[in-house]
């Protein structure tokens, strides 16, 4: 079985980010000696634990703009923090991060020379990373280029900037230039592949995060709460795409509890302290994120799983072709899904096409409340949803997806 030597450029293997989890799952079977990583924010000890590699090359820490974002999240009120926040927003609006030059370090050149990658795989993500990838290719003339895109950043990264029209043109020209150099392109879902074929005339092979169906089936359901209580779980980040939808469900749960229902909504998130306060909602709780390995057991202890993406114009544009990493885990969990998101985005289309979730496409708390009420009082309805979701999850089984991924990369060597 052929496993080409792959240098992963720009993204690390990890167990906490969508990209890191997906890449870890896709490359799970790769021999250690055939995979190397050159990445930002590289945690070698974590890689060694979950996805060992032949070589590791750190490319640096967080960018200037990312450091501003981090400081804003944890800032104290005061003149200095206010000025820092204003400067950070100005930095983002000017798009200064895209003007950076990312150097090709001697350690990276040594890796390319000694490892001799058959393929350099990059997710890119910005203009400066496109230029960096192009420069790296000059030092690896015999390596093939594989691109993997999971968000529609080529069409949205510049939203909100000054001279947006100028940045749009810059991104379009640069992305088309790197696409012309690519030997194989991959996307996060078929909807993105179809859209990019129309826009760029390039075939993108879809690869979503695979799931170990057998592993999930072996986990028994153990209720967290007593009989008679309908429990709902959300696991994930709290950001501009999810904050308002989470509050909408909290309002719906609070109203149902006031009307005599017994409903609990639990949120597990890595950023619980800084983005949302659930103390005013009845039956709603927020907890720190649990280790990734404990999530399957946690999911199977609830009556419903809440999955959402935002309804704002900014969110709609950014996530229109995206597919959440955790979707496959939701599908295989055996727990009915309550999906709350715009109708036109890829996630809604995919799940609705197969009837794999209770779908609420209107940003209306009353409609969301009624959808939840239907789930509370109809086991037959929930069982039907679960059955369809499981059938859909089989398409994403690790054995199928990993082999297709291996063949796709091997085909260009």
What are these regions (language model features)?
Residues 44-101:
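A conserved catalytic-core segment of Leloir-type glycosyltransferases
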Residues 191, 209-210:
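Carbohydrate-associated surface elements
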Residues 241-244, 293-295, 305-328, 337-349:
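Nucleotide-sugar-dependent
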Residues 363, 367, 379-410:
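A charged, aromatic-enriched C-terminal amphipathic alpha-helix characteristic of glycosyltransferases
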């Amino acid at each position: 079985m052929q496993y080409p030597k792959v240098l992963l450029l720009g993204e690390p293997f990890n167990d906490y980010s969508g990209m890191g989890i997906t890449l870890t799952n896709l490359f799970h079977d790769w021999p250690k000696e055939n995979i190397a990583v050159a990445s930002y924010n590289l945690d070698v000890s974590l890689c060694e634990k979950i996805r060992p590699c032949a070589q590791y090359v750190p490319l640096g820490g967080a960018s200037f703009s990312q450091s501003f974002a981090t400081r804003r999240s944890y800032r104290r009120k005061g003149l200095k923090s206010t000025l820092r926040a204003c400067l950070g927003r100005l930095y983002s609006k000017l798009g200064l991060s895209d003007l950076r030059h990312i150097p090709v370090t001697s350690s990276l050149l040594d890796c390319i020379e000694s490892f001799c990658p058959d393929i350099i795989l990059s997710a890119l993500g910005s203009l400066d990373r496109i230029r960096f990838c192009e420069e790296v290719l000059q030092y690896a003339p015999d390596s093939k280029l594989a691109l993997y895109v999971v968000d529609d950043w080529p069409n949205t990264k510049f939203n909100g900037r000054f001279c947006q029209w100028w940045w749009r043109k810059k991104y379009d020209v640069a992305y088309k230039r790197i696409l012309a150099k690519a030997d194989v392109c991959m996307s996060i879902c078929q909807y993105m592949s179809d859209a990019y074929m129309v826009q760029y005339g390039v075939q993108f092979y879809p690869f979503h995060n695979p799931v170990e169906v057998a592993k999930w089936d072996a986990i028994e359901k153990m209720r967290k709460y007593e009989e008679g209580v309908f429990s709902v779980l959300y696991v994930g980040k709290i950001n501009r795409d999810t904050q308002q939808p989470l509050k909408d469900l909290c309002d719906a749960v609070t109203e149902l509890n006031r009307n005599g229902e017994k409903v609990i909504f639990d949120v597990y998130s890595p950023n619980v302290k800084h983005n949302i306060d659930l103390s005013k909602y009845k039956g709603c709780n927020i907890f720190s994120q649990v280790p990734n390995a404990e999530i399957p057991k946690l999911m199977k202890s609830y009556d419903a799983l809440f999955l959402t993406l935002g309804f704002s114009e900014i969110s709609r544009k950014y996530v229109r072709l995206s597919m959440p990493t955790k979707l496959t885990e939701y599908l295989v969990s055996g727990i009915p899904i309550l999906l709350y998101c715009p109708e036109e985005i890829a996630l809604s289309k995919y799940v609705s096409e197969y009837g794999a979730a209770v779908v609420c496409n209107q940003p209306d708390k009353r409609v969301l409340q009624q959808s939840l009420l239907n789930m509370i009082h109809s086991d037959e309805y929930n069982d039907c949803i679960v059955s369809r979701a499981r059938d859909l999850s089989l398409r994403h089984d690790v054995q199928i997806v990993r082999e297709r991924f291996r063949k796709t990369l091997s085909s260009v060597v």
